[in-house]
Swiss-Prot record:
PANTHER family: OLFACTORY RECEPTOR. Disulfide bonds join 101-193. It is found in: Cell membrane. Odorant receptor. PROSITE patterns: G_PROTEIN_RECEP_F1_1 (PS00237), G_PROTEIN_RECEP_F1_2 (PS50262). It is a multi-pass membrane protein. This is Olfactory receptor 2T29. Keywords: Cell membrane, Disulfide bond, G-protein coupled receptor, Glycoprotein, Membrane, Olfaction, Receptor, Sensory transduction, Transducer, Transmembrane, Transmembrane helix. InterPro entries: GPCR_Rhodpsn, GPCR_Rhodpsn_7TM, Olfact_rcpt. Residues 54-61, 125-143, 224-240, 297-315 are cytoplasmic. Pfam families: 7tm_4. It comes from Homo sapiens. Belongs to the G-protein coupled receptor 1 family. Glycans are attached at residues 3, 9.
């Protein structure tokens, strides 16, 4: 907050202008309705998944505990950007103060970083379940799961605490127009009138590290899973193992692919329009897709949903 105040004193201005999605749309009202519906579906889908996991005893396992954490992150993730964007469209306002921008940036970085590490933790959980089934209850007991989940949230917040203060401390005098629908680090950094090349290099290295550690864990886990599945004699066992892992791999590819584009590709690959479309995909659409991916192909989740609906219908 002190850095943001110093920045405001230096520039004499405290508001950014979010250019957003709606300026380029021929039908902004229709786009607003679509995004609002998607937002509600994301919240309701993830909330239902959390409720099912909490209420159904058959889903009280480490795998579903981590899925519930992912749903919680997705609900917070989409809530950081979409409500502000829709409210601005309704009110006809596109300004965001520096403190609000910094807070949005911090929450976004924290949640994105936490999800990176959570997806790696989920891959490790699948490795233990498939490769060491007899030791699974001991290796992944409730205390270990809580520790791993807490570690994911903590490591994600490190990214937010590192990048947000530095980004918001730069003097902004070229322009105050953020060509994005929220305060994303690259979109804000480009507005600075000071030399940010060193910071961009450090940010790149930080993002590589944030991606490299989880990707290494995920790759190693699935390599060992493939070796174990290959040695299985039971075709049914192979099918179940692949079904369990395919949902997680789908989410990993969607989320990490978008992150690699945003933070690791050279600036020559980027345009404001491309960046916004990619951001729409992983900040708005991914939270909608995750509960569908984890539930539609999961017999236990669908069984719990049918049971809950049957009980409510009978009552």
């Amino acid at each position: 907050m002190a850095n943001i105040t110093r920045m405001a004193n230096h520039t004499g201005r405290l508001d950014f202008i979010l250019m957003g999605l709606f300026r380029q749309s021929k039908h902004p009202a229709l786009l607003s309705v679509v995004i609002f519906v998607v937002f509600l579906k994301a919240l309701s889908g993830n909330a239902v998944l959390i409720l099912l996991i909490h209420c159904d005893a058959h889903l009280h396992s480490p795998m579903y505990f981590f899925i519930s954490q992912l749903s919680l992150m997705d609900m917070a993730y989409i809530s950081v950007t979409v409500p502000k964007m829709l409210l601005d469209q309704v009110m006809g306002v596109n300004k965001v103060s520096a403190p609000e921008c910094g807070m949005q940036m911090f929450l976004y970085l924290t949640l994105a970083g936490s999800e990176f590490f959570l997806l790696a933790t989920m891959a490790y959980d699948r490795y233990v379940a498939i490769c060491h089934p007899l030791r699974y209850p001991v290796l992944m007991n409730h205390r270990v799961c809580l520790f791993l989940a807490s570690g994911c949230w903590f490591l994600g917040s490190v990214d937010g605490f590192m990048l947000t203060p530095i980004t918001m401390s730069f003097p902004f005098c070229r322009s105050w127009e953020i060509h994005h629908f929220f305060c994303e680090v690259p979109a804000v950094t480009i507005l600075s009138c000071s030399d940010t090349s060193l910071y961009e290099t450090l940010m790149y290295l930080c993002c590589v590290l944030m991606l490299l550690i989880p990707v290494t864990i995920i790759s190693s886990s699935y390599l060992l899973i493939l070796l174990t599945v290959h040695r299985m004699n039971s075709a049914e066992g192979r099918k179940k193992a692949f079904a369990t892992c395919s949902s997680h791999l789908t989410v990993v590819i969607l989320f990490y692919g978008a992150a690699v584009y945003t933070y690791m590709l050279p600036s020559s690959y980027h345009t404001p329009e491309k960046d916004m479309m990619v951001s729409v995909f992983y900040t708005i659409l991914t939270p909608v897709l995750n509960p569908l991916i984890y539930s539609l192909r999961n017999k236990d989740v669908m069984g719990a949903l049918k049971k809950m609906l049957t009980v409510r219908f009978v009552l």
